[in-house]
């Protein structure tokens, strides 16, 4: 007897799925970008001390702390030390030409006269890392061949950004600026710069165009450390100078002018112990040496230094951890610090790729639908053995030879680009991008 066929079960869209007939409904936005403020939380910040420009001032003061400055110098140095290059959208000759143009405009590997210094972009990003947000105005000028080329990027410091203006959908529309113009008495107030004319760097953005300072988590440790240092200095002073004592006649009563004068003498000595003291004949002044030893404050300072370093993602020797490494899928062990550096390098590159590169490409290639991208590779290659480096040298030596077997040449060409770079194999596409720019990209006038 033939089995009766089962009726196919009707698929019912579950939570998070969508019926194919409703796919067109995904077009367009229904939810505007909203402010992340609730109760005492204003733009992700609950501490009034750190809200607005008052918070920026706190972060600026933190730069005078040795541990903070040391960590920032290390982070910024590692970010800059990577090998930065522009990767074309494809191996198409036009895409390679566009990438070479961007490479020349950004001044990568070229610090000659007439080139925009690549380090300026890092300087703007460093402000974003410290304060949460920073920007620069993109200024183009006409090149010798009629192309619009990068003249300069005018830094916009976070202290000069009064507010971000948004459109009706909650998207950023313009930056409102104010501040005194350097070299003159002019004061700019309420100047609006369209967002499309800027390159904006945001650190730790949650999607609402509100960055957060990398120093935010280090603030409690910095405040405690600063208060502790003041106590240590005060205690050390008392330990070295002694505790002042003033013996006055029994006839001097509390609340009298003589009593207030006695208090003033002791107070002045505490504030200025090197100054002389004039006393009435029957008054006696002395200092009492402290017999007990001062408490050891080094462990407390070390603890807060370690907390500052951890907040910045730095695994220094002050951070007493036994698990400062993390396993990744290729079997390497990458330190906490290196993971932090890579994350920041990607954050920097993403902003350049999103806010700057398209604005340099489209004025000169209006029909472009794909863009080159800024990317990087780490300077260190300690995880590769000498044998791997030797292999790369051998490949470079034989890959262009006519006598090389076809199978071996095909194998070399099939190597992933990341592996080719790791082995040190010369990348023809990258070399074409890095060729020195010719006179077509020179300026028709001097920069201001």
Curated annotation (Swiss-Prot):
Pfam families, A to Z: P23-45_portal_barrel (PF21919)
Presence of the UniProt keyword Glycosyltransferase in the record: no
InterPro entries membership: P23-45_portal
An example Gene Ontology CC term for this record: viral capsid
Disordered as annotated region, ranges: 1-25
Family: Belongs to the P23virus portal protein family.
Protein name as catalogued: Portal protein
Organism annotation: Thermus virus P23-45
